[in-house]
C-alpha cells in the first residue's frame, strides 16, 4: 500500500495478513490517496478529500414506490453535502422533515450514540419531525397509509439548500 498526501508520497508498506498499516503524518487539508498493489501491480486506488462547508441536503432511497397497505416502510438516507456533492463529516445541523400526502413519518435516526432525543413522533399521524444530523448523515422512515398517493418528503436546515424526494404509494 502506498499513501500520498497532497501529492507528496509518504511511502509504501507491505500489508501483513489480517493486519493494518499506519503512517506518521501531520493533518493538513487536501487530498489523501491510498494505492494498493499486488505482485507489483496497482489493483486499487482510494481517494479522500477535505470537504468544503455544508451546502445542501440530499435524500436517497432504494425504493421509489411502496405498498399502500398501512404497514410498508421506506428508509430514506439523508446526506449533508458540500457544493461538490461530498458528505461533510463534521456537519450536524438540525434537520426538519416535512411530509405531504397520505403517509406518515414513522421514525428517525442519526447514528449518534450520545443522542438522547426522541427517535419517533408521539402521535400516529406525524407529518413533521426534527433531528440533528450526525457526521453528515441521518435517516427517516416513511410509512404508507391505505390510500395510494405520491408522498412528498422535504428536509430543511438553516443555511442549507432544501432536500426533497417523492415516494409513490401503490395498492397491493
Ranges and model annotations:
Residues 35, 71-89, 95, 151-155:
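Beta-strand-rich structural segments
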Residues 4-8, 44-47, 73, 84-121:
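Short flexible loop/turn segments that cap and initiate beta-strands
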Residues 1-45, 61-62, 80-84:
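Long hydrophobic segments that form regular secondary structure
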Residues 40-52, 161-171:
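Edge beta-strands of extracellular beta-sandwich domains
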Residues 29-30, 146-152:
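Short tyrosine-centred short linear motifs in exposed loops/low-complexity segments
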Residues 18, 68-71:
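Solvent-exposed, conformationally flexible loop/turn segments
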Residues 51-69:
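Low-complexity, acidic Ser/Thr/Pro/Gly-rich terminal tails and inter-domain linkers that flank the onset
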Residues 22-27, 124-146:
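Short, hydrophobic beta-strand segments
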Amino acid at each position: 500500500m502506498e499513501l500520498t498526501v497532497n501529492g507528496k508520497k509518504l511511502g509504501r508498506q507491505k500489508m501483513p495478513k489480517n493486519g493494518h498499516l499506519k503512517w506518521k503524518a501531520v493533518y493538513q487539508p487536501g487530498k489523501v490517496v491510498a494505492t494498493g498493489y499486488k505482485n507489483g501491480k496497482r489493483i486499487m486506488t482510494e481517494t479522500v478529500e477535505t470537504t468544503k462547508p455544508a451546502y445542501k441536503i440530499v435524500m436517497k432511497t432504494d425504493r421509489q414506490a411502496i405498498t399502500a397497505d398501512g404497514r410498508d416502510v421506506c428508509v430514506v438516507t439523508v446526506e449533508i453535502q458540500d457544493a461538490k456533492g461530498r458528505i461533510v463529516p463534521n456537519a450536524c445541523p438540525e434537520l426538519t422533515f416535512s411530509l405531504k400526502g397520505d403517509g406518515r413519518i414513522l421514525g428517525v435516526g442519526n447514528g449518534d450514540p450520545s443522542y438522547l432525543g426522541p427517535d419517533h413522533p408521539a402521535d400516529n399521524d406525524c407529518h413533521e419531525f426534527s433531528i440533528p444530523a450526525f457526521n453528515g448523515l441521518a435517516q427517516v422512515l416513511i410509512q404508507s397509509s391505505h390510500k395510494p398517493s405520491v408522498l412528498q418528503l422535504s428536509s430543511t436546515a438553516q443555511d442549507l439548500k432544501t432536500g426533497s424526494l417523492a415516494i409513490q404509494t401503490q395498492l397491493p
